[in-house]
Amino acid sequence: MRPYYEDDAVTIYHGDCREVMPLLPTPDAIVTDPPYGLGDKWQGGGGETTKSSWRFDPSEAQAWDSAPVPEVVDLASAAPAVVIWGGNYYALPPTRCWFMWDKKQNDQWTTAQAEMAWTNLDRPVRMFRMAQAEAYGSMNKEHPTQKPLALMSWCLEMMRLEPNALILDPFMGSGTTLRAAKDRGYRSIGIDLDERYCEIAARRMAQEVLSLRLGIWSQRVVLGLHARTDRVGR
């Protein structure tokens, strides 16, 4: 199957993860945030998310947006290490270790004060504390349930993966898992059914490559200037 995007660390596929995953190598880890209840959640609120350019159109909801995806349960045994955000919506096996995001929300009635991720790890519960208002900085959310980059990077840290591990996100969205994996030196594969998100994720990965190259170039320029200054000083 031809990738939608590919570089040295990241591969993105546009398609149904149920069809794409059998064609892929077995990953070392799965880190994902599958859709659940988006259709119901967003239809009554005017259709706009806070600090976001994303706008929900109920007519665009996928069939699984109004109910949990049953195939998500199969992911629990699809890799040696698995993290599934929203795992409390699924009939997943009992686990000792949940990842928790404490959003530090003061509102006790209308919004969740925390989010939960099911894991298959044999460790105590782990808590990530960051106010939702601070989690995204100046970045616009491009997906309704987009997780903060810092949160996904923390997930990977807590998983204690081997260097160069291969991470799969079958519900990639805007590509935050892939970005976090790339920043930590891991390889990753992302899949999404919506081509818009494949485009957004590919753009984020390409920008990272460009930023890295510009950073290396700038560093070389600075080092060159220092070298010239040293020669002049002598």
Per-region residue spans from a language model:
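Short acidic-hydrophobic surface loop/beta-edge motif
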Residues: 1-7
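Conserved SAM-binding strand-loop segment of SAM-dependent methyltransferases
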Residues: 9-15, 213-216
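Amphipathic alpha-helical segments that form coiled-coils or helix-hairpins used
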Residues: 11, 20-23
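Conserved SAM/SAH-binding loop
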Residues: 15-19, 220-221
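Short, well-ordered alpha-helical scaffold segments within catalytic/effector domains
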Residues: 18, 69-70, 148-153
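Class I S-adenosyl-L-methionine
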Residues: 23-32, 36, 40-62, 76-234
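A short, well-structured juxtamembrane/interface segment
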Residues: 63-75
